[in-house]
Amino acid sequence: MRYNQLSYIPTSLETAVAELQALGFAVQQEQAPKENFAIFLRKLFFHFQDTDYPLSHMIASKDLDLLTFLTSDATLTKEVFDLVALQVLGFIPAVDFTDAQDFIQKIGFPIVFDSQQLLLNLHQLLATRQKSGVTLIDSLVSQGLLPMDNCYHYFNGKALATFDTTSLIREVVYVEAPLDTDQDGQLDLIKVNIIRPKASTAIPSMMTASPYHQGINETANDKKLHRMEGELSPKAPRRITVEPTDFQPLATKPSRLPVNECQETFSHISSYTLNDYFLARGFANLYVSGVGTAGSTGFMTSGDYAQIESFKAVIDWLNGRATAYTSHKRDYQIKADWSNGLVATTGKSYLGTMSTGLATTGVDGLAVIIAEAAISSWYDYYRENGLVCSPGGYPGEDLDVLTELTYSRNLLPGDYLRHNDHYQQLLSQQSQALERQSGNYNQFWHDRNYLPQADRIKCEVVYTHGLQDWNVKPRQVYNIFNALPDSLGKHLFLHHGEHVYMHNWQSIDFREAMNALLCQKMLGQNNGFTLPTIIWQDNQKEQTWKELTAFGGHSKRQIALGDDHVLIDNHYGEEDFKRYSKDFRAFKAELFEGKANQAVIDILLEEDLPINGQACLKLKLKSSENKGILAAQLLDYGKKKRFADIPAILELDSIDNGQQFAREALKELPFKDSPYRVVTKGVLNLQHRSDLLTIEDIPNDQWMTITFHLQPTIYHMAKGDTLRVVLYTTDFEHTIRDNSNYALTLDLEQSYLLIPTDEEE
């Protein structure tokens, strides 16, 4: 384990003492440090009447137990404090370490002992994570240090788990959205599942906008998958034009219906454990699936501002600006009189995507978004540079396939009976509008691009994204983060995992940092917390995170690619083509081993290469036909230790998100030997070699010069490492599987690689 403590808020001695005393630690500024130390330690064992017993099982040095030390005349030193602090945090001498001082350095222990400031040291110790992944104070509260009295209690600017999760209110309401997406003449109703504690004051809300949450239709999804095999068709040259998105909600008016209490409850809904963490700390949890999902009405419009409006309506209801009904009969309205109107949105992938879309509406009441692996432009999810480009791991998926997956109204037989025929008509229109045949950007995709509305965002923004996420690729967060107004509080966590959550990792106190931020923004805590702009996981060191100021450098390093001509054949023999089409992973493995149709350029680095941003290939090439796909990958090549892209479980049920509530596993990305690592990649339709909106002819056997930007990343390579450039045509995971007989020729002498290298240390 290594500490990267973001969440601790430095405080005054007076505040530290007051907070310690409020928790029952009877320390006093006037008392000697060793006496305060003993009082603090004995309070940790509040389950014991005889606290001598647990103290006797700890040590103060290699030859002295802690109880004996505390009752002796020996002085409290840094060595004693550090050794005891490690044990309090769950580290075991002779098991986790032998030399405490060496171990303190190795793990980056965040507390610097000062006998004159011991109470501040103890205050920080309570706010420091144990080996198990929870802070010492959270561990104590989970054991019953404080009662679950449904009132807010804070420590170091963060809410504690004092809300009773054994007696929660679970209710369902139906919010009226200013939409009629299924064209039935009635405003769409949006089902909202609410879980909230029995608080006596108005409370904020965590809202997860999840089109998956009311169920998914995998059968319909699988039937709708598109065939990847086909021929890349040349497109007529033209300039693509689009109009600004102009979504207009329908008119609504305040309801005059009588107000009633909730008429529908539920016992269970699958939850997100970060929400559970905040539920125990006095935040309501809302799960909303939006239009076209089971329990709601409307059509699944998949990514546009109508879908986003269905989630926005819920925030409007929480603030008294929209109507919610107790049932589909629409005969009683229900008020959110328990809400303080402030909302934070959470969730990964589609869920985080809806957070971004919501933020671009500028809706009042949305205080913070915590968007993980979020899409900012749906075109860039299903397309790339004029090509159909399936998300990593899901060849054949497209937006209409996602619609089939998430249109969960068809999982209700009555809804299927009444509405499926009309749904199929609307789905057919959607399938036509997404222009799969051409791969072009068009108005349909522009209406699902949130980047032009980024200047409307006014809430605090937190993004997390994996630099090995080839599902929702890094360009999605790179573009939205760099489009955000400078006036915003904006924060980005970049890790080296794939499409994964990171709130339960051992090496970074993400949960606690979000606690401090949300208490500041949603509970009025003037805690002085400041979250860095960018927190990046160092790819060269295990469990090490660094603070940066920018994603994307302005300095460029030019790297030559060679001095000869290379030919890349697109066509494969029938057996190989069938094998690769059946298993794209076999294609990837052979591509990385240099066994596919490709050009491979190995570059031995003569100096460190700190990549930050979009690597760019400047290439001179020609195609034997009037079409062509160019794909590229950059690899960190050669055996060495690197991060795996999926977090491993360190300890099951290690993290208690409340008081014996919603336990989850502690995880971390393994750091282990591997033969190579994908640094970045991309695909390009050569007819879009100038820009996305310009379609150009490809003249047969005539040289062209292209600029090809790959996916952005932050990745550091060292002197002596090998950077492998892989250039090829068809990508069996992502692009159309075109086996036609054409070839690309590259003039490497007239080509080069540009690497952005601005970095902060």
Swiss-Prot record:
**Can you state which reaction this protein catalyses?**
Hydrolyzes Xaa-Pro-|- bonds to release unblocked, N-terminal dipeptides from substrates including Ala-Pro-|-p-nitroanilide and (sequentially) Tyr-Pro-|-Phe-Pro-|-Gly-Pro-|-Ile
Tell me where it resides. Cytoplasm
Q: What GO MF annotations does this protein's record show? A: aminopeptidase activity; dipeptidyl-peptidase activity; serine-type peptidase activity
The GO biological-process annotations, alphabetized, read as: proteolysis
In terms of SUPFAM superfamilies, this protein maps to:
alpha/beta-Hydrolases, Galactose-binding domain-like, X-Prolyl dipeptidyl aminopeptidase PepX, N-terminal domain
Q: What Enzyme Commission number does this protein have?
A: 3.4.14.11
Top EC group: hydrolase
Functionally, this protein is described as follows: Removes N-terminal dipeptides sequentially from polypeptides having unsubstituted N-termini provided that the penultimate residue is proline.
Protein name according to UniProt: Xaa-Pro dipeptidyl-peptidase
Provide the species name: Streptococcus equi subsp. equi (strain 4047)
What gene, per UniProt, encodes this protein?
Answer: pepX
